[in-house]
Each structure stands twice: as C-alpha cells, then as structure tokens.
Amino acid sequence: MAAILYIVGSFIPLYLFSDFLQIHIDEIPAFIASFAYGPLMGVVVLVVKTLLKLPFTKTLCVGELADLLYSLVFVIPAAIIYKKNRKFKSAIIGFVVGFVLQIVVSFFFNIFVMIPFYGSIFELPQAFLDAKWTFALSAILPFNVIKNLIVIAITLPTYKSLHRLIDKI
C-alpha cells in the first residue's frame, strides 16, 4: 500500500489557491489500508509514504511532516470509527469526523506554526504575516474542504469495489 501511495502521490494543483496547495490523492490508499486492516496499517502507510518523500522535499521537511499530521488526523478517526462497526454508515460517520478534525487542525496549525515558520525562513513581508487569518480563511480552509471532499468521493467507491477482494487476502 505504501508503494501505491507513493506512486499515486502526484499533485493536482488547484489554481484558485496558492501554488503550494496541491491535492494529494495519496490519502486514498491509507484510507483503504486502514479500513481493510485497521488504523495502525493506515498509520504505517502514511509514515512510509512520508519517509519516501522526505529526500525530495522542497519544504525543509516541514511541509511533508505537516502533511503527515493532517493525513493522520483525517485517516485515524475514520478508521477507528469504521473498525468498531464495519458498515457503510460507520464509514460515512468516520469520514465526517476525520474531515472536521483535519480542517480544524490544519487551519490552526497553519496559523500558529506553518505561516510563522515559513515567514521567518523565507523572510515573508510583515503584511502577509499580519494577514495570516485572512489567508487561512480564504485559501487554506476552502482548499482543504475541496481536497477532503475529493479524497472521500474517490475512496468510498474504490473501497466498496475492493473490500471483498481485500477480505479474501
């Protein structure tokens, strides 16, 4: 699963937002692994994917580690909820919980950690740093909502079509 995750980890830019905001569909294999084999497998897949990406980073490793955090917050709650009751309704509830948690964590982590960090490293203008709440509300928040909806929309039918095959393995 980690190898698949690395391969599908291509970026899909949404040109409405900043160029560093790119959709990573690499959460899909992590969801499939965690739904099939439990939350720990989802964690393993995400960590391996991150380790594979670190040597090629352009973000001083910080972007990849933040992406790992956001992905873990999205995948783990969904996997835990689904593991307790392996029904479609549980998957939906898990996706909603993970969705909301990921949005909240990524929003505040960007405001209090990522933007100030990159501001100091790349000497961003003070006006940008002063407008971090506006930037987070107008770019980061809508981007993550769109990204999460795309990931869920692809994961649900993919897992539904694969779960019988996975159960036989």
What do these predicted regions represent?
Residues M1-I169:
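Loop-helix junctions at membrane interfaces
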